[in-house]
């Protein structure tokens, strides 16, 4: 195997490194820079510019200059974040089969294609630097990226001519680069605030092992959002002075964006900066110039709520990991936006300890990816990465309940199976609805996909055994399969169509799950009671039909009346578990003699109605049915 390229494919900038001569080293691009802007531009002459050259011409070509494409990777157009992206980004975002894509000069490009152009440049620059062909790569992604986003990232690599050996999480990669796996076992937190995404991950490291304990973050929080706060402030000030809305002029807005980014960087070392943009626009009275001063205090007031949001995420991650602030031995700062003084101050204040800033925050993730490349190439020994799935995975079962197959926080790769059955007699097919989240009901969780297992042989409900298997590979990409154990017929789906969960959504799901826990459990108890009652009615009616005239007419009438009472309660959407249980008890008592009569029959074999709805003896069979 040749050299493996470690790539940090960032929202704002990307970096690359390689493991050679016993250490990871950053590879400079052809321009001599250690980072490459993740920007692609299309010129009127049909040229495609990537990196610095694309960034330089953005002011004169804003609608054909594509930046922050990572923000719409795997995003569905119906999502709220898609509307935010459309409002903020100057290029044309369109709907392509439900997913976000972009349109430039009448041509449609997917986020994968745009990202691939950045990766192609990096591959070419690496080959020029190393003097050899590079085909293998390890690419990093935010820890909360879902299956579709991870697969899209891998596809971008493939389009760029790379063989993507592994997709790994950015904070895990950073921990490797800091050499934290070489120390004694300890708990660390990686705080990763980049240009467009934010990640907090709690890890346990030591003795060559890096294990993720919990992760959180936001796909729409980063340096871009800090820039946007400055842009909004400057635009509002200019409008109040001149009456002109410069946001309506894409070329003027691009100039303000560039100035805002520069001001943000200057305020990391200076206490005041000036934005000076002559001839920004014009009206009937002549040209207008934009000149305004911004102090660090003003900047911090503009972004204070965003920084506070990151602290809340730290609290949630520590809670999920079962750690206190005092348990954390190292706080590692990653990402260019961690240079902002307010960010450092608030994180330091929260943990009450000095922060680890010993490695360049723009380069650390790429260095870690190169080390993982060395592991895969066999050049690095005794290093093991253990990542986790950020949310539970499961399927929808009878009554709209989500039945979990893989629990949140499970170390990946992971493979787990459960046995389900049919909900109706002679049911010819089952629909497998794959879900992600922490709520009790399917509708409250994220839908990842759906498929059907067909041609199930005719059989009574509960008889067919459908084995559903969830398989998450080391890249975090999920495959779900279903097998009819009676016939061997199978079907599977690789989850690729979902839009991706931002960690904001993940955090909201967890919070919602906690807030609605009592309510959800109450609703779930009603659904389970209804399912059990329905099974009891089904079995009782079947026993009555089997016995026919051999059963006492008065007893039969009493049972039928009890069935009718129970069916009436089941039709009531507002029925409580207690009301259902009361009618179930009445029918069960009435059915005792029916059970005795059934067992007394010579052919036997009929199960008593009182046992209906109980769990099968097979420990692998769970008490849930697939609609």
Swiss-Prot record:
Pfam families: HSP70 (PF00012)
Alphabetized CDD domains for the sequence: ASKHA_NBD_HSP70_DnaK-like
Family annotation (PROSITE patterns): HSP70_1, HSP70_3
Acidic residues: compositionally biased ranges: 618-627
Residue numbers spanned by region Disordered: 598-627
Claim: Transport is one of the keywords in the record: no
Entry's induction text: By stress conditions e.g. heat shock.
Keywords: ATP-binding, Chaperone, Nucleotide-binding, Phosphoprotein, Stress response
Bias kind Low complexity: ranges: 598-611
Example GO molecular function: unfolded protein binding
Residues modified as Phosphothreonine: 197
UniProt family annotation: Belongs to the heat shock protein 70 family.
HAMAP family: DnaK
Function: Acts as a chaperone.
Stated name of the protein: Chaperone protein DnaK
Gene source species: Sulfurovum sp. (strain NBC37-1)
